[in-house]
């Protein structure tokens, strides 16, 4: 059975590594974050962030922008189509001081 993968987004310039436990196709990336500073959040199969690259390579699955609005939380529900294998790593990269949040990947 496919399982969801929940990971905290640390905020600032950071990367979260999510190790996949079984082969499946991830179809949804739900992200919530505190909108504390301008920045970006990126879902990728590469351990190297491509935030700041205008035309990233195909390892970047999705990218979100965060404005400098300090009034609360933002959420995004992004449809994706990402086949993954057991023990493969998927990465969530972020920039923006204080953009703490949660990433949920699911089938």
Regions found by a protein language model. Name each.
Residues 6, 49, 58-60, 81, ...:
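Intrinsically disordered, low-complexity segments enriched in proline/serine/threonine
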Residues 36-58, 102-105:
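Short, surface-exposed beta-strand/strand-loop-strand elements in extracellular ectodomains
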Residues 1-25, 30, 34, 93-107:
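C-terminal interaction-tip segments
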Residues 6-9, 54-70:
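Solvent-exposed serine/threonine-rich low-complexity stretches and specific carbohydrate-binding patches
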Residues 25-27, 37-39, 88:
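A generic structural signal for short beta-strands and their flanking turns/coil linkers
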Residues 15-21, 62-97, 105-107:
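Beta-sandwich interaction modules
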